[in-house]
Amino acid sequence: MTLRIGIIGTGAIGTDHARRINRVLSGAEVTAVTDVNRDSAEACVAGVAPGAQILGSAEEVIAASDAVLVCSWGTAHETQVLAAIAAGKPCFCEKPLATEAYGARRIVEAEEAMGRRLVQVGFMRRYDRGYVALKETVRTRLGPPLMIHAAHRNPSVPGRYRTPMAIHDTLIHEIDVLRWLLDDEYVSAQVIFPRATRHTHAGLRDPQIVLLETAKGVRIDVEIFVNCRYGYDIQCEVVGEEGTARLPEPTAIPTRLGAVFGQPILMDWKDRFIDSYDVELQDFLKAAAQGTAAGPSAWDGYAAAITADVCVQAQERPGAILPVTLPARPALYA
């Protein structure tokens, strides 16, 4: 059976997922789309989803599909995911699951009431080959992890990007993937602001350093520098009792030209994790065909949202160490 996929939100990521489903992956096709900007929906259909109908609302797309992808603005995610759960439809939701932790909690409660998993959150780094290999190395060779040094650097961000977005739009990936990497929970967060780059603007403090502590005592420092200029650069080094392990660099051709040894650095986040997007979405389609969901769960989205909210509070109190408190994990997500 070919799954009928509906896409809510046909911006860059929604359209790219439509291309992925129709041209790269197996077992599904995009049959319905919607977007608040009809021109965007029409461009998506014309470019990568010629068989899809354009509908007027998220509710119509959910009703017309076997499973849905929520790729709209983050503020709309909670309502649209809850509607998919109420309809019993598997739902892939791009991050954030909700813009506030209490919204993510409502999604968890709705899924619990349904009695089965229906939601997968788009934390694609868990599917990246480098992170998968790093997790296995941490598990089998390093001994107990002691520290993590990480960095998330973007060449630039638009003028509408503000200080809290460094947490909810950028650090959110590290919040999830490092929790997964360590199989551990956060207990505190702290934010420090170094000297600001001249390439930022009045509404954005850049760079930032976020310090996290886990229940097992692991200390994590994450540099967020979203106007670094030179490229899109993701770094992660785990320090264990027996040694260290580092996330590998993306595959690129090193050159020796003009008396210079060099290797290119990617500029676009889509290029850095393009393969992991394919793997995560195929994982969703496989589970959706069985009427359920796999991969990062609504609970993972909720845990990330709680941590992100505390980090934003820590931005407002630079240097203060604030507690991160998670409720007990429900049996559905054990």
From Swiss-Prot:
Keywords: NAD, Oxidoreductase. The keyword Glycoprotein does not apply. It catalyses: myo-inositol + NAD(+) = scyllo-inosose + NADH + H(+). SUPFAM superfamilies: Glyceraldehyde-3-phosphate dehydrogenase-like, C-terminal domain (SSF55347), NAD(P)-binding Rossmann-fold domains (SSF51735). Coiled coil: none annotated. InterPro entries: Gfo-Idh-MocA_inositol_DH, Gfo/Idh/MocA-like_OxRdtase_C, Gfo/Idh/MocA-like_OxRdtase_N, MI/DCI_dehydrogenase, NAD(P)-bd_dom_sf. Pfam families: GFO_IDH_MocA (PF01408), GFO_IDH_MocA_C (PF02894). It comes from the Bacteria. GO terms for molecular function: inositol 2-dehydrogenase (NAD+) activity; nucleotide binding. GO terms for biological process: inositol catabolic process. Its EC number is 1.1.1.18. Involved in the oxidation of myo-inositol (MI) to 2-keto-myo-inositol (2KMI or 2-inosose). Belongs to the Gfo/Idh/MocA family. Homotetramer. This is Inositol 2-dehydrogenase.
